[in-house]
């Protein structure tokens, strides 16, 4: 009986260990499912004309559906300051404004949580509104979030950029990429030309510049003249004439020279 009980204990140990691992895995799954990331998108910087309305755009992305627990908070860090001030909060369709004097009676809600939009408007912006604006969104269970930061500049109307900042950034990026591509293509062409010159094994410079003399071509009449005229004082061996007669007549020992016959001059030195 003792032996059987001991065997039962040995068999039960792996079962209990497997059960413990299952519980830990389930708990870890609940923790990771309960807290997920939420992404916030804002422009890096915007320019607003003095005395006009400025819109602070804030979009967010969440895997969870927005509802009564979704909230939006805006805070402000004045230019040159190290601390931030919360001046706006939105939750369950209600707007809660802070007591910060520079924003009194200037803030209005311009977003739509169903469209993942948490933007606000600021009326009659002044130079005191220069600084950094922070957009923070909570949408449980998506609560782990990196807030969006906007650097806002209030300037005179004549100092407003001709193009929006994002357009300027896009143009500069396109120009840099284009120049990089052009330089890469030029370097590739130069590299290929260099390799082609290195692999070429043709004639040398002196050989390529040496003129090539070709012997003049002789016509049948020139051959006949060569037979008639021989250099004076030179030793001449026997000359043999060969005549090809295509007329079909009888053979003759007499050589009749004509324009249609080619004569061969064979000399023996």
Curated annotation (Swiss-Prot):
Keyword flag Transmembrane helix: yes
Pfam family, one: V-set
Keyword list, A-Z: Disulfide bond, Glycoprotein, Immunoglobulin domain, Membrane, Phosphoprotein, Signal, Transmembrane, Transmembrane helix
Modification sites for Phosphotyrosine: 241, 263
Glycosylated residues, chain numbering: 50, 130
Record topology, Cytoplasmic segments: 184-269
The keyword Flavoprotein is annotated on this UniProt entry: no
Transmembrane segments: 163-183
Bridged cysteine pairs (disulfide): 58-135
Complex formation: Interacts with phosphorylated PTPN11/SHP-2.
Function of the molecule: Cell surface receptor, which is involved in signal transduction processes. Recruits PTPN11/SHP-2 to the cell membrane and is a putative substrate of PTPN11/SHP-2. Is a major receptor for concanavalin-A (ConA) and is involved in cellular signaling induced by ConA, which probably includes Src family tyrosine-protein kinases. Isoform 3 seems to have a dominant negative role; it blocks tyrosine phosphorylation of MPZL1 induced by ConA. Isoform 1, but not isoform 2 and isoform 3, may be involved in regulation of integrin-mediated cell motility.
Protein name listed in UniProt: Myelin protein zero-like protein 1
Record organism: Homo sapiens (Human)
Classification of source organism: Eukaryota, Metazoa, Chordata, Craniata, Vertebrata
